[in-house]
Amino acid sequence: MGRRGTRDTGPDGAGEPEGVPGTELLADADRSDSWFLVVEGTPQSHVDLSDPSYLDFSYMRRIAHAADLVAPAGEPIDALHLGAGALTLARYVAHTRPGSRQRAVDVDAPLVEMVRRRLPWDRRAQLRVGIGDAREWIGARHADSADLVVSDVFAGARTPARLTSVEFYGEMARVLRPGGLLAVNIGDGHSLEHTRAQAATARAVLPHVALTAAPAILRGRRFGNLVLVAGHRPLPSEDLGRRAHRDPEMARLLEGGDLDRFVSGRAPVHDADAVDSPAPPDDVF
């Protein structure tokens, strides 16, 4: 998590929300009106209800870099979010790009209702949240309908296998507009075999792919989050790299030859051979 949370206070009381077993809302001890959402022991989201532009988790800032660069600053966009959590990025987009049309989906109905009730978002936001399977939901969306697609889906601390394949990436690419960006959150560590295969998978579907993460994670020295950014057209790589370098947790951007060497001949993943993302070590959180 990186910083402290406490169960002492919260919106309507902190701790385990009624009717949502395994889920905790923890007040941020260092920041007022801010909360950590923890699911099955895994810190899933952080939200600042007073300032949605504040992003505590470094991987979320890396996804936000893509959201910032997909269109001119302040211009409304159409965004799809696979995995709702506490809707941190959707709140960010609504705040930084007023008038954006956003849809999000999550399979966990009690969690979505708890977030709606306990961590309400700005009513002016054009944000609709549905309940359902991310892959089925994205398959029902119209082609060329989104400027930004974010895949941040975890069952506990692992991404389900069916959300890691060429077939799934193909559905996300189908709904992405020509100038749009796809951002995928990946949890991995040590050999980074899962991430290498995911980069190969994204490349099998979209011609332009980059990967960003902290150097220690890219070297396999610790388990953490890596973010894939992909699109039909060349990426805003210079700006992405500059923002990654200037982030409070500095990151590197891999693309082109650097990404070739990282992937190092790994084959794309298909439904028939897909597996869940690796589980983090017990002491990560």
Q: Can you annotate each of these PLM segments?
A:
Residues A155-G156, G187-S191, A216-L218:
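Short "lid" loop at the C-terminus of a central beta-strand within the Rossmann-like core
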Residues D30-V39:
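N-terminal glycine-rich anion-binding loops that anchor highly charged ligand groups
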Residues Y169-G170, H194-P215:
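Conserved Class I S-adenosyl-L-methionine
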Residues V38-H46, V149, L181:
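Short, basic/glycine-rich phosphate-binding loops at helix/coil junctions
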Residues E16-E18, R31, S50-R174, P178, ...:
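The AdoMet/dcAdoMet-binding core of the Class I SAM-like
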Residues L163, D188-T195, T201, P268-D283:
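Alpha-helical subdomain
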Residues G179-I186:
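Conserved beta-strand signature within the Rossmann-like core of class I S-adenosyl-L-methionine
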Residues G2-A29, Q44-S50, R219-F285:
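SAM/dcSAM-binding transferase cores
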